[in-house]
């Protein structure tokens, strides 16, 4: 082990050093030259000088600050130390700063092009890029809800996007470029530590996008079943396959689109109502509030909701949803009350 370390040191440091190591060595040599040279020539003129003073003079000269608290008084100190430190030191320092700036630019470019690996926790991962507007709306709606929070990190995975758009950069979205069905790509997005995953259709309106979403769902569920996955699909026939793949929730946009069209025809204005209820940006929203405590009739639960500024619409249970149930319908602990209100309630009890 020691022999291997020595060989690595000889190869990487002595025989084939990187540019950064070369610059660091040259800077250290210049600091040593300036410090020792300043003391060697100036100590006779000023016996109170110390090594710290010599180092300070060298640093001040190399950075062109020039405080003037220390300066060479002898001709040898000026021409053999001062001039070399000024010319060569400034050049070396400028080159070192340019290397640092180039490294920062390269790092930022890699991040925007999706070449980075992220170490995150309790974040959201969005799969596929159907367009800036869709991604923006999903993130903004989620961040407006206290359950999600404004500070939660978001990672976007897509294999075709060349660079993260400026609009998503403003939302502090991280980008991972790669095949979303591959383990290597999922690892780079820290999928094992994520709490939520939203799988969007890559080409809205194209049922063929469902095949990719099924593969992504299988890849996620094969790694971590604790991730809460919501999948968009185009073809209603795909829903059963997605359930078998293990996703938690499915949104069939083609089916909802047909429903919205027919309802708008039968009940003009329903679109405005749903837009208000489904958006966190304005008005009232739907909420699923956990019920806590002893079983109670729906009438008592509705009264408790009204007392907190909410309207009770129904109950979500393991066997389905009950909308506008009978007044004596029993609501048990663990079930969720469907309400409409101005903000999310943590729990509901009677």
Map each language-model feature to its residues.
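Cytosolic regulatory regions of ion transport systems
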Residues: 1-34, 39-42, 46-48, 61-63, ...
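The feature identifies polytopic integral membrane transport proteins across all domains of life
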Residues: 50-57
């Amino acid at each position: 082990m020691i022999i291997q370390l020595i060989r690595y040191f000889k190869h990487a440091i002595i025989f084939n050093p990187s540019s950064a190591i070369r610059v660091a060595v040259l800077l250290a040599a210049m600091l040593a030259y300036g410090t020792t040279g300043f003391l060697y020539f100036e100590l006779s003129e000023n016996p109170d000088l110390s090594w710290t003073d010599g180092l300070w003079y060298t640093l001040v000269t190399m950075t062109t600050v020039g405080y003037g608290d220390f300066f060479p008084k002898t001709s040898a100190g000026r021409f053999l130390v001062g001039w070399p430190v000024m010319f060569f030191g400034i050049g070396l320092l400028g080159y070192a700063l340019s290397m640092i700036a180039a490294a920062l630019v390269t790092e930022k470019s890699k991040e925007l092009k999706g070449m980075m690996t992220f170490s995150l926790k309790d974040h959201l991962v969005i799969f596929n890029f159907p367009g800036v507007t869709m991604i923006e709306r999903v993130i903004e709606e989620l961040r407006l809800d206290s359950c999600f929070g404004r500070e939660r990190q978001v990672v976007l995975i897509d294999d075709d996007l060349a660079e993260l758009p400026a609009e998503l950069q403003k939302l502090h979205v991280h980008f991972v470029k790669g095949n979303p069905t591959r383990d290597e790509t999922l690892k780079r997005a820290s999928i094992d530590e994520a709490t939520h995953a939203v799988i969007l259709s890559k080409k809205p309106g194209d049922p063929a996008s469902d095949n990719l979403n099924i593969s992504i769902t299988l890849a996620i569920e094969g790694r971590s079943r604790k991730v809460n996955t919501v999948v968009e699909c185009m073809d209603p026939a795909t829903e059963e396959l997605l359930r078998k793949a293990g996703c938690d929730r499915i949104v069939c946009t083609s089916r909802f689109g047909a429903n919205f069209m027919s309802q708008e025809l039968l009940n003009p204005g329903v679109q405005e109502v749903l837009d208000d209820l489904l958006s966190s940006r304005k008005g009232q929203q739907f909420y699923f509030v956990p019920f806590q405590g002893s079983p109670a009739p729906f009438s008592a639960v509705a009264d408790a909701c009204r007392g907190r500024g909410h309207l009770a619409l129904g109950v979500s249970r393991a066997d389905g949803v009950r909308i506008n149930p009978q007044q004596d319908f029993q609501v048990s602990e663990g079930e969720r009350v469907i309400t409409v209100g101005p903000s999310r309630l943590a729990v509901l009890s009677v």
